[in-house]
Amino acid sequence: MTEFQGYLELDRSWQHDLLYPLIFREYIYTFVHDHGLNRNKSNLLENVGYDNKSSLLIVKRLISRMYQQNHLIISANDSNQNPVFGYNKFFFSQMISEGFAVVVEIPFSLRLVSSLKGTELVKYYNLQSIHSTFPFFEDKFPHLNYVSDVLIPYPIHLEILVQTLRYWVKDVSSLHLLRLFLHEYYSWNRFRIPKKSISFFSKSNPRFFLFLYNSYVCEYESILLFLRNQSSHLRLTSSEGFFERIYFYGKMKHPVKEVFADDFPTNLWFFQDLVIHYVRYQGKSILASKDMPLLMNKWKFYLVHLWQCHFYVWSQAGSISINQLSKHAFGFLGYLSSMRINLSVVRSQMLENSFLMDNAMKKIDTLISISPLIGSLAKMKFCNVVGQPLSKSTWADLSDFDIIDRFARICRNLFHYYSGASKKKSLYRVKYILRLSCVKTLARKHKSTVRTFLKRLGSELLDEFFTEEEEVLSLIFPRTYSTLRRLYKGRIWYLDIFCINDLVNYE
């Protein structure tokens, strides 16, 4: 992002004029294509040259035509090529929206960095790894009692997205252009695929979609943080929350004020939240607390009223369940986490007297849910739905080295990601599926049977599937039963993981 800011010479004063780089800095569209900002690389973007799709004259003409009335009318002829430009209108609006997302992301990122500098999170870059939340669970969750898994509602109304952005983007013309993009996408998708408009929107224009989603989540979490910070000041003087971003908070002079009178039969006292933890991941969030369910119920109604009153998204309090960690397990990023109580007896002796003490220690168990893993492997044609390995026919044309390397990389990354699991028995089943699928793919390529190919190849293929920790331990210790048992039970956290893409990238 710093590189783009240097090229565009964009600082915070450009919040009042965001259309200037979009119209007069045409190399933005080259950045979108050449720097891999558009991860969903369509055939159009790969086959069309820069001179044909990103000239300044075409961009200016297209923006002018977008404001004409006949351009917004969706008809059956829109799928054909435009006689003026040579491509359909949706392609050009997608191109400009990608450039628009790049320009607007810069002040958005500056706002995020400036907000983080004002907090105690000095090394905020450590939060980039989503896998770093698991050590947090190990340290904090044994001391917590209740957890709630919340699905962040989305999508919201298009106009609410524009109103959310207008509080920090002061360029009115950019907001009008954003509104035009949103309504055009909505009209286009409603005409072509009415049931999967959001899915189509996110796949056809991922950068633009992620920018809108991140702005929505940033606004939602800023209000949530505001409520959390102000909750400690509301004990003596009751206050009323106004869900307006400009005039958000108002003090009440009288000591007690009924808040949400239609939903609560008695006066509601705000009180300080001693322990409340919030974690967000992949469109979901987790709320955890040590206190009684009263605190969790209060924040559950906070969230419901926030979504309904501010973002106009329908949500029900009954859809947010509050579970006790000692009795219920919850799924998180492919793990199945639960609370385990380790009982032990400690003998204590003081002078001539001795007595026994029962000691109970809480520990988080992170297990691997094998069913989603088998489902992902079956979807990518590595096995069938019951886990029987299959040959990967689409990779049969590759070289032997590439085939083995791809299978081994997927296996190592899965072990890398699930290294923090308490038990790794399910991972060894996945390794068996990938290893046998690799052998079947090679045998299919060489038109041989699996048995014959294994005899000719020997045990060299097995070495490619050793994981990183297995290689290190094999150099230090002999491969005995005790070593494998420690490896099976050991928990090694790798904090450099962003995502697992190998099952998808090669398709």
From Swiss-Prot:
The keyword tRNA processing applies. Keywords: Chloroplast, mRNA processing, Plastid, RNA-binding, tRNA processing. GO terms for cellular component: chloroplast. It is found in: Plastid, Chloroplast. Its main location: plastid. The keyword S-adenosyl-L-methionine does not apply. GO terms for biological process: mRNA processing; RNA splicing; tRNA processing. GO terms for molecular function: RNA binding. Belongs to the intron maturase 2 family. MatK subfamily. Usually encoded in the trnK tRNA gene intron. Probably assists in splicing its own and other chloroplast group II introns. HAMAP family: MatK (MF_01390). This is Maturase K. It comes from Cannabis sativa (Hemp). The gene is matK.
